[in-house]
């Protein structure tokens, strides 16, 4: 008979021993370092993690996640995924068809016979209809007396809310019957409303009151483009194509449509060999143009964005460039010399009131003709006269006021009847220079003062609202 050996009992795990022997201090030497993570392998991992990054692999001494798939705690069972199966549909029962059964399935159910109504009467015989004739000659009398019953005409109104004007909506009426209030209304609403008296506000005022409750203080202005900041690089463009076709300075392509007043966006920065103008290298965006005045010039400006560097995330980094071109300088305001509006015509006679009166040629003809005197014009205030007809008005515009001596003379009464030609009478006294309110004015040669010595003398003549004899 062979004796059976006693079964070996399994030793408790390190975690179970650590819970019971830690407090009493009777733990084996390999339990505490294993549970607390102070073994030689753990220390090597701690020292190596200072210089090597092993993130995402689940290797370390900290409380990690166990990598991508996680880990199962000690003395526990891994979780299982419960597979929930979808219930299958019940099979369709297939009816067997025998060889004698019809293979065509009727779409309509069997219906009962519908009664077609009464039968059609049948006629027998060939005699046809019988016509009865009478020899009575009495005329037929018809009773046309109206009936004695009264005819009542009634009308009914139906209200349609969809076609009811707002100005014709009636106020709902209320009536009380046996202590119950009944509301009836022909409108679309289902309840009555309450009339609230309206008050009138601001019945009087000065007209300067604000139209809003909180007026905005000051004037809001739109900020202009900041073209001359330190963050923008200033580049002057001398090519005239910058005004009409700025994309031609960046690429040799000929676009079909190029907006003039909008932002131009390029898909990618072109290589240096494909850029006609090196100032437009790495440009990916040209903003809309702006006209500004800078130091006495009209300037055409566009702000450009460069794409010089790309980060790992794909974002482009570049400087901003201000491209400008001066169109024309703004000239200062010049003083314009004023000229008289009524310039003397070639056929007008110019009279110089400051002419030298001395020995000279004086043309005087017999009869009532005009006397003309030509002298040197050394003054800046000429007088012009325009003679439209024989009895025309004389206009003398003075540039500066001049003191003129006015001499009165005898009055000549004009005739009441107009006769043509009209010959004015000669006044008896001819010692005056100009006759005011007369039929005509005369300039006699004897009135000029002739001196034996050549000297300058001022002679004042005054013509106002008068006529000259031709």
Curated annotation (Swiss-Prot):
Its main location: virion. Highly phosphorylated. GO terms for cellular component: host cell; host cell endosome; host cell Golgi apparatus; host cell nucleus; viral capsid. Coiled coil: none annotated. A motif (Nuclear localization signal) lies at residues 1-12, 449-459. It is found in: Virion; Host nucleus; Host early endosome; Host Golgi apparatus. GO terms for biological process: microtubule-dependent intracellular transport of viral material towards nucleus; symbiont entry into host cell; viral penetration into host nucleus. The keyword DNA-binding applies. Interacts with major capsid protein L1. Interacts with E2; this interaction inhibits E2 transcriptional activity but not the DNA replication function E2. Interacts with host GADD45GIP1. Interacts with host HSPA8; this interaction is required for L2 nuclear translocation. Interacts with host importins KPNB2 and KPNB3. Forms a complex with importin alpha2-beta1 heterodimers via interaction with the importin alpha2 adapter. Interacts with host DYNLT1; this interaction is essential for virus intracellular transport during entry. Minor protein of the capsid that localizes along the inner surface of the virion, within the central cavities beneath the L1 pentamers. Plays a role in capsid stabilization through interaction with the major capsid protein L1. Once the virion enters the host cell, L2 escorts the genomic DNA into the nucleus by promoting escape from the endosomal compartments and traffic through the host Golgi network. Belongs to the papillomaviridae L2 protein family. This is Minor capsid protein L2. It comes from Human papillomavirus type 10.
